[in-house]
Amino acid sequence: VNNDCNCFGLGVSLFGEAQGYRDAVCVTLGTGVGSCLIIDGKLYSGQNTGAGEIGNIPYLDKDYEYYCSSRVFVGMDTTGKELFIKAGEGDAEALAKWDEFGVHIGKLVSLIINAYDPQVIVFGGSIAGAFEYFKGGTYKELESFPYQRSVQRLKITTSSIDNAAILGAAS
């Protein structure tokens, strides 16, 4: 028995974008934030399958799960899907909100680099499909990260496998 993000990470490490990397952090962005660790090519889930879970770490006035999931869009009086459609139409306000979201993701990535120093971070989940709209804010935030060599050596990508969690669970 395992959690959905651990299954996603296992699937991505065996069949997707984390394949061939020794150390990876896989993050699902959706109604919440899930994360898992691939260390030395193997899923590391800890004693209770929660190793690497960073969504509940305090951030600003709430936690990372609030600011890096669909919950933050409720506070913006919109939804991720609405913003995705509007951004695709070139709506400046929607693009600005995605940029703001990207800044929060950049802070999350900074935390991941400090804690785990992975070779690759793979995003999955319903919000990952909008990476093209929030990656600018993410990378802009990472410009202030004190160890730029770590940022330069890190690959940040999204999963192209729709059923990575199923593949991971079946492995």
Annotate each language-model stretch with its function.
Residues 1-64, 168-171:
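Phosphate-binding/catalytic loop of phosphoryl-transfer enzymes
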Residues 14-21, 58-171:
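ATP-binding/phosphotransfer module of carbohydrate and carboxylate kinases, centering on a glycine-rich
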